[in-house]
Design a protein with these regions (language model features):
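Boundary at the C-terminal end of the N-terminal hydrophobic targeting segment
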Residues: 18-19, 24-25
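Terminal, low-structured helical/coil segments at or just beyond the last alpha-helical repeat
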Residues: 171-179, 236-265
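Short coil/linker segments at helix-helix boundaries
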Residues: 33-45, 66-106, 114-150, 160-199, ...
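Amphipathic alpha-helical segments of tetratricopeptide repeats
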Residues: 52, 102, 202, 235-236
C-alpha cells in the first residue's frame, strides 16, 4: 500500500474540506428552494444534510431551526402525543439556534431564531413556564434588533412580547416579580407593542402575520378602526408562510367580530 507523502496531507485535507463546504452550500440552496415552496419538512432534510457535512455551518444551523419552527407550528391538535412532538421540535429549534449563536455571536439570525422558537413554545405552555421564557425571549429579540435593524421577525417577536406581558394575569405577574425582580415585566406596555409591530409591518408589509398580530393589539387597546385597516390590508397579500391560510381565516373572523365596534381611544 502506497503511503501519502506528508507534504500532501494538508493539501488533501484542504481539498476535502472545500468539497464538503461546497456540498453543504448545495444542500442549503436546495433547502432554501423548498422553504420558498412552503415545504419546511423537506427543507429540513437538506439543512440536516448540510450539517452532517459541516456541523459548524452557521447558515445551516439557523435555517434548520427555522424549518423546525415551521414544521412545529402546523401541529395544531389536542392529543398529548402530538403536543409532545410539537414541543420537542421547538426545543430542538432552540438548541440549533443556540449552536448558531455559539458559532457566530454577532449574527442576528441565530438570536432571532432563539426568540422565535421560545416565543412559539411559550404560547403552548402554562403561565409559570411562559414567564420563565419571557426574559430570554426579550433579551434575544433585543440582541437581534441591535445586530440587524432590518430583522422584521425580531421586531414582531418584541412587539408580541410586550402584548403578552400586558395580557398576563395578576398571579402570573406575581410569579414573574418573584423570579426576576419587580422591575422586569414593568417594561411591558401597549405603546411598545404597537411600535414594534408597526416597524415589522413597515419592514415587510407583505407579511400576513405582522398585520394580524398588530390588529389584535389594536383590538386590545380599543383602536378598532386601525385594527380593521390591518385586517383588510392582509386580505389580498400572497401566501408566503405555512400558516398564512389560517391567518387569513382568523383575520376574516376577527374583522367580522369587530365590524361594528367604535374606537375607545
Amino acid at each position: 500500500m502506497r503511503r501519502i507523502p506528508a507534504l500532501l496531507i494538508p493539501l488533501l485535507a484542504a481539498r476535502l474540506l472545500a468539497a464538503q463546504t461546497a456540498s453543504a452550500a448545495s444542500e442549503i440552496r436546495s433547502g432554501d428552494s423548498l422553504h420558498a415552496a412552503l415545504q419546511p419538512d423537506q427543507a429540513l432534510v437538506h439543512y440536516r444534510r448540510a450539517l452532517a457535512l459541516d456541523s459548524a455551518n452557521y447558515e445551516a444551523l439557523w435555517k434548520a431551526s427555522r424549518a423546525l419552527v415551521d414544521v412545529a407550528k402546523q401541529m395544531d391538535g389536542k392529543g398529548d402525543a402530538l403536543k409532545k412532538r410539537r414541543d420537542s421540535l421547538y426545543v430542538e429549534a432552540r438548541r440549533l439556534a443556540e449552536a448558531a449563536v455559539r458559532i457566530n455571536p454577532v449574527g442576528a439570525r441565530g438570536h432571532s431564531m432563539i426568540a422565535q422558537a421560545l416565543g412559539r413554545l411559550s404560547r403552548t405552555r402554562g403561565g409559570k413556564e411562559r414567564v420563565r421564557f419571557a426574559k430570554i425571549i426579550y433579551d434575544e429579540a433585543e440582541r437581534a434588533i441591535a445586530l440587524d435593524s432590518t430583522d422584521d421577525i425580531a421586531y414582531h417577536v418584541m412587539g408580541a412580547w410586550h402584548a403578552e406581558v400586558k395580557r398576563l394575569s395578576g398571579i402570573q405577574r406575581f410569579f414573574a416579580k418573584t423570579l426576576f425582580g419587580a422591575g422586569f415585566l414593568d417594561r411591558g406596555n401597549w405603546d411598545d407593542a404597537q411600535r414594534y409591530l408597526l416597524r415589522a409591518v413597515a419592514l415587510k408589509p407583505q407579511n400576513i402575520f405582522h398585520h394580524l398580530e398588530l390588529a389584535e393589539i389594536y383590538v386590545d387597546v380599543g383602536k378598532y378602526s386601525l385594527a380593521r385597516d390591518q385586517l383588510r390590508a392582509l386580505h389580498d397579500l400572497p401566501i408566503a408562510d405555512v400558516l398564512d391560510h389560517q391567518y387569513k381565516t382568523q383575520a376574516a373572523t376577527l374583522l367580522d367580530d369587530i365590524k361594528n365596534e367604535k374606537d375607545e381611544t
